[in-house]
């Protein structure tokens, strides 16, 4: 049975880069991993495969949406460390529902019997306020992971995601594994002071602290995971948090919680008082 992860966070927070590096860390520790990009931009797997691969929606269009005519080879590309990548895709900008495509991708995975093929399935999901379609991965996930930075907008989005996870946990098995602090900067960004307080308030923990480092940004543009980049100063330190996350997830029963989110209005007044 696959370990299913759903990675969420505010738009532009670094979810795909973080997801790809978590997938890489897991794969290098021996896990067979499938990463699923759930964003119309279809660039989640770019650091893994080094290209923008064909999306599920594009493959379905080619067969007039007859799922039974598709095989795994039509929608899956294998990249770094043997990681398989799949991109849900989406409708043209300004039309259609991207969340619907996520649901279609989940259906296709089930029909192809892929849930039993992998040790880990990681959904990299668009969005900070989760609609029905984009929340679909939470129906299947064992654990949700929130990516956040040490600022109000990111924390507000994380709190909204905690609301979605709490709601889904009533009917489904999903729990929150924790928050990954991304782009941590102790010089100008306050480190993780606000994230630490938020995590304690909602009943979760910081899984790891990913530093703000130019090498991570460069790896994204290069179409590589950080693990695949040439050795250079700072690389080893940047790899530490991704390996910490992988080690945590590969435990027999990783500790996780159902978060207790803060009310929308309450969080505005509360965060303003955090230092």
UniProtKB/Swiss-Prot annotation:
PROSITE patterns: NIFH_FRXC_1 (PS00746), NIFH_FRXC_2 (PS00692), NIFH_FRXC_3 (PS51026). [4Fe-4S] cluster binds at residues 97, 131. ATP binds at residues 12-17, 41, 182-183. It comes from the Bacteria. It catalyses: chlorophyllide a + oxidized 2[4Fe-4S]-[ferredoxin] + 2 ADP + 2 phosphate = protochlorophyllide a + reduced 2[4Fe-4S]-[ferredoxin] + 2 ATP + 2 H2O. It is an enzyme of class 1 (oxidoreductase). GO terms for biological process: light-independent bacteriochlorophyll biosynthetic process; photosynthesis, dark reaction. Mg(2+) binds at residue 16. Its EC number is 1.3.7.7. Belongs to the NifH/BchL/ChlL family. Component of the dark-operative protochlorophyllide reductase (DPOR) that uses Mg-ATP and reduced ferredoxin to reduce ring D of protochlorophyllide (Pchlide) to form chlorophyllide a (Chlide). This reaction is light-independent. The L component serves as a unique electron donor to the NB-component of the complex, and binds Mg-ATP. NCBIfam families: DPOR_bchL (TIGR01281). This is Light-independent protochlorophyllide reductase iron-sulfur ATP-binding protein. It comes from Chlorobium limicola (strain DSM 245 / NBRC 103803 / 6330).
């Amino acid at each position: 049975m696959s370990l299913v992860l759903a990675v969420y966070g505010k738009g532009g927070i670094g979810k795909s880069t973080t997801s790809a590096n978590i997938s890489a860390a897991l794969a290098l520790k021996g896990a067979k991993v499938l990463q699923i990009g759930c964003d119309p931009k279809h660039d989640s797997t770019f650091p893994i495969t080094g290209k923008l691969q064909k999306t599920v929606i594009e493959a379905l269009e080619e067969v007039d949406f007859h799922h039974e005519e598709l095989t795994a080879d039509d929608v899956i590309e294998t990249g770094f460390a043997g990681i398989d990548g799949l991109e849900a895709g989406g409708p043209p900008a300004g039309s259609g529902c991207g969340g619907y495509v996520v649901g279609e991708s989940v259906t296709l995975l089930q029909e192809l019997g892929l849930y039993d093929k992998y040790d880990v399935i990681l959904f990299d999901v668009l969005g900070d306020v989760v609609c029905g379609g984009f929340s679909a991965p939470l129906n299947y996930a064992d654990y949700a992971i929130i990516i956040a930075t040490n600022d109000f907008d990111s924390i507000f989005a994380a709190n909204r995601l905690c609301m979605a996870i709490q709601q889904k946990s009533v009917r489904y098995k999903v729990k929150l594994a924790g928050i990954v602090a991304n782009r941590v900067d102790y010089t100008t960004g306050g480190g993780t002071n606000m994230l630490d307080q938020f995590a304690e308030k909602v009943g979760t923990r910081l899984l790891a602290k990913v530093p703000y480092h130019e090498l991570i940004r460069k790896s994204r543009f290069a179409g590589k995971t950080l693990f695949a980049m040439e050795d250079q100063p700072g690389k080893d330190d940047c790899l530490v948090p991704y390996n910490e996350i992988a080690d945590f997830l590969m435990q027999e029963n990783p500790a996780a919680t159902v978060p207790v989110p803060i009310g929308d209005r309450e969080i505005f007044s509360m965060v303003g008082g955090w230092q």
